Every structure is written in structure tokens, then in C-alpha cells.
């Protein structure tokens, strides 16, 4: 069922619009392995959808004595400079549908602006969004709701009538915390149960069904 009078569509990037989570995971796995630390699914879940330096700073782990910013930079350097990512199913159609319907569109991501711009190149770049909120725009990342609150503020949109799409529990919590009325959990990275436990209104396998939900 289409959410009535959608005030804005708020889209996460990694794992929602583009298939970049394997690229992120490879960098983390290499960095952890070099230190003899395990990077299993439970550890990966701490980082997915969050800024790595926030995790290093606030979550206890074998990294506790390191500098969060330095550790983040070390991981980033392990990602190949010539990386490319592919749009996930339904990403292009969702953006096109929202723009055609006149629904204000925002990117809300834990990535920095440089990463976001490159990752979005196959979809038309940051320019396809009415606004974008990246890690460069907020002091604290997801699951803190500041990023979603800022996106709604910039768009002049009622959060309660907005729709957000997120692939990770941390992102779902951020959107719910900002009062976003409809939070769709996209099961590209986590099972539906995990996303519902985080507060997702409903779950979908990918964005292919979203244009129909938005336009009725």
C-alpha cells in the first residue's frame, strides 16, 4: 500500500542503492586479519551501516587502544583505488520514479561525500538528489538520528510522512529515531527479522517493488 502523501524519499547508499558491502567487507577483513583479529558476521554487524570511527570510539573491542581516525584511514587504504560498484536492482527505477512523481529525494549515508559521488556515478551522481547528507554533514553517524533529521530539515519535509529505505539495523534505527513514518528494510545485507527488530515498518527484498509503492 502506498504511504499517503509521501513528503520525501530518503535513501541509504551502501547496500541499498549500490552493491558496495562486499567491497567494504574485504577491506575490513584484510585489516582485521593483519592484526590476528576475527571479523565474523557478528563483528561485521557492528560496522555495517555505521561510521567505522564511531564504532571504534564507542564499542569495546581489540581496537580499544587505537586512534579511531587512524584506524579508519588504514582500512580505507586497503580498498582498491580503481573500485567500481554496481547499482542494486530497482535503484535506478526508484530514483526515476520519485523524480517523475515530484517526491523530494535525499541521500542519507554514513559514507563521505567523495565516496558517495563515485559510488553514485552509474546512477547519475549526487545531482539526482535534491539534497544529500553524508558523514561530512553530521558529527555523529547512524544509528544516531541526526542525519535523517537533517535531510528532512533541508527538504522542508514532514518526517512522519516520509519514507526511508535502509539495509542495516543501524540505519533503520536512525530513521526511526528521527520520526520517519515509513521505514522500509531492504534485505540485501540482513535478514528481515533483524531489520524488523530494529524498527522497520516492513521489509522488501530490493528496491524493485518501491516505485509501485510510491506511485500507487
Task: For the regions a language model picked out, list residue spans one by one.
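Residue-level marker of regulatory loop/turn positions in helix-turn-helix DNA-binding domains and
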Residues: 87, 108, 140
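Proline-centered loop/turn at the N-terminus of a beta-strand
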Residues: 104-106, 182
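N-terminal helical cap/lid subdomain that shapes the substrate entry/recognition surface
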Residues: 2-96, 100-101
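Asp-based, Mg2+/Mn2+-dependent phosphohydrolase catalytic module
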Residues: 1-7, 92, 96-99, 112-216
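Residue-level detector of alpha-helical recognition elements and their boundaries
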Residues: 30, 42-43, 59, 70-71, ...
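Conserved phosphate-coupling serine/threonine residues in phosphotransfer and NTP-handling enzymes
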Residues: 16, 109-111
Amino acid at each position: 500500500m502506498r504511504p499517503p502523501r509521501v513528503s520525501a524519499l530518503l535513501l541509504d547508499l551502501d547496500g541499498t542503492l549500490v552493491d558496495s558491502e562486499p567491497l567494504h567487507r574485504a577491506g575490513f577483513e584484510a585489516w582485521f586479519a593483519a592484526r590476528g583479529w576475527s571479523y565474523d558476521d557478528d563483528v561485521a554487524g557492528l560496522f555495517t551501516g555505521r561510521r567505522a570511527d564511531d564504532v571504534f570510539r564507542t564499542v569495546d573491542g581489540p581496537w580499544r587502544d587505537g586512534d579511531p581516525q587512524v584506524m579508519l584511514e588504514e582500512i580505507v587504504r586497503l580498498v582498491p583505488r580503481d573500485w567500481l560498484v554496481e547499482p542494486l536492482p530497482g535503484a535506478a527505477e526508484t530514483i526515476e520514479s520519485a523524480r517523475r512523481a515530484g517526491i523530494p529525494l535525499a541521500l542519507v549515508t554514513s559514507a563521505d561525500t567523495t565516496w558517495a559521488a563515485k559510488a553514485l556515478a552509474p546512477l547519475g551522481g549526487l545531482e539526482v538528489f535534491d539534497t544529500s547528507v553524508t558523514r561530512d554533514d553530521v558529527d555523529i553517524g547512524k544509528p544516531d538520528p541526526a542525519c535523517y533529521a537533517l535531510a528532512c530539515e533541508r527538504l522542508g519535509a514532514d518526517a512522519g510522512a516520509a519514507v526511508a529505505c535502509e539495509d542495516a539495523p543501524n540505519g533503520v534505527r536512525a530513521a526511526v529515531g528521527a520520526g520517519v513514518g515509513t521505514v522500509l528494510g531492504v534485505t540485501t545485507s540482513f535478514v528481515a527479522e533483524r531489520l524488523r527488530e530494529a524498527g522497520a515498518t516492513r521489509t522488501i527484498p530490493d528496491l524493485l517493488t518501491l516505485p509501485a509503492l510510491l506511485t500507487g
